[in-house]
Amino acid sequence: MIGKRKEEHIRIAENEDVSSFHNFWDDISLMHEADPEVNYDEIDTSVDFLGKKLKFPMIISSMTGGAEIAKNINRNLAVAAERFGIGMGVGSMRAAIVDRSIEDTYSVINESHVPLKIANIGAPQLVRQDKDAVSNRDIAYIYDLIKADFLAVHFNFLQEMVQPEGDRNSKGVIDRIKDLSGSFNIIAKETGSGFSRRTAERLIDAGVKAIEVSGVSGTTFAAVEYYRARKENNLEKMRIGETFWNWGIPSPASVYYCSDLAPVIGSGGLRNGLDLAKAIAMGATAGGFARSLLKDADTDPEMLMKNIELIQREFRVALFLTGNKNVYELKFTKKVIVDPLRSWLEAK
């Protein structure tokens, strides 16, 4: 059941329009410097993310696992992560807890030397739903399965509200994270709706080490689940998916809200190296890419490598044209921000 759902998610993300109405990264412009006074060849793109050295401030965000087609996708993504010295997460690992026979769709990434690996479990699975919550032993199993450096706890309650089989209880999630944070390095990850400052503060107080914002600008899982509901002719869930298609906090605003609290992965709608530079300029430590890499990871590994290479090149060009010789300096680059994003920033 879970594997079938994950395969449906992959196919919908590859073949349907599941983007939010507006990409808020387009509301940001970085100040151009006609004379950068920088040697392009000396630009340093490396960053330290909570003690892990990345050659480039990019993380392949959690996407998939638990379905047979996911094994090849994760293998290709891991090869790319090793080659470019970037981080990588896998999709929700609940499927491996339920069915150990598909654990290789996740552990395949151990064939490559990925400098930063992120395991993944859903916040809804941390508390009792119609089934028992996952145990600490279950969490240790998935963490060890990929030799993880961090555990992403993904918050997908909008998706759960649209999903025909969705979970409805969030009471107790913070307490469970407090319990787990003593044993695991936790990253709180949204899945398309972003984090408010209020929620981020509660998560940091509970022991979360970093936040991946994944806000409005990119894939919306309300849309993904809308297409699943349409296939099943579930009119109620289709209606909810349409109504909440664009629900949430813009990705750049969520970065701005959270970046003085903890290291932030700016994700949700990043398309290229310039978007990545904007994420860093808004306060992120690194940027997360997902859907823009998915199809190539599935069907064309060579194009996947080329795509990441171009993202890297675009990012270096953005550093050069803003007069910055390293990633840290980019955080202080002057920005011009217009509405509708500007209004969201004022809501902090």
Curated annotation (Swiss-Prot):
Name the enzyme's class. Answer: isomerase
Q: What is its main location?
A: cytoplasm
| Gene3D superfamilies, alphabetized | Aldolase class I
- Record-level GO BP terms: isoprenoid biosynthetic process
Q: Which residues bind substrate?
A: 5-6, 92-94, 159
Database matches in InterPro entries: Aldolase_TIM, FMN-dep_DH, IPdP_isomerase
Protein name (record): Isopentenyl-diphosphate delta-isomerase
Instruction: Report the source organism.
Output: Thermoplasma acidophilum (strain ATCC 25905 / DSM 1728 / JCM 9062 / NBRC 15155 / AMRC-C165)
